[in-house]
Amino acid sequence: MATFKKFNKDKRPKRNTQSLLFKRKRFCRFTVTGVEEIDYKDVDTLRDFIAENGKIIPARLTGTRAIFQRQLNTAIKRARFLALVPYSDQHKI
């Protein structure tokens, strides 16, 4: 009967990934400032929620509440359609 040795992966030193990355407390920027509705013409605010590659940053990363995230998505899509914000990073303004 052949016996096989199990390789113990636990011998490798474990890194604490949470301490390596600085985690700040996420909060909804729109709730704090008292914004009732997000406007598609406010391009500076919209750019804060668009990644470098042109994708919309999810609420779990930005901390935006669900109601404002839906408004934000609609506003970004309207601004893209009207060419106020580029669709991707390949398009320069």
From Swiss-Prot:
Annotated GO MF terms: small ribosomal subunit rRNA binding; structural constituent of ribosome
Gene Ontology biological process terms, A to Z: translation
Annotated Gene Ontology cellular component terms: cytosolic small ribosomal subunit
Superkingdom per UniProt: Bacteria
Coiled coil: none
Subunit structure of this chain's protein: Part of the 30S ribosomal subunit. Forms a tight heterodimer with protein bS6.
Functional note: Binds as a heterodimer with protein bS6 to the central domain of the 16S rRNA, where it helps stabilize the platform of the 30S subunit.
Gene that this polypeptide is encoded by: rpsR
Record SUPFAM superfamilies: Ribosomal protein S18
Family note: Belongs to the bacterial ribosomal protein bS18 family.
Keywords recorded for this protein, A-Z: Ribonucleoprotein, Ribosomal protein, RNA-binding, rRNA-binding
Protein name: Small ribosomal subunit protein bS18
A Pfam family of this chain: Ribosomal_S18
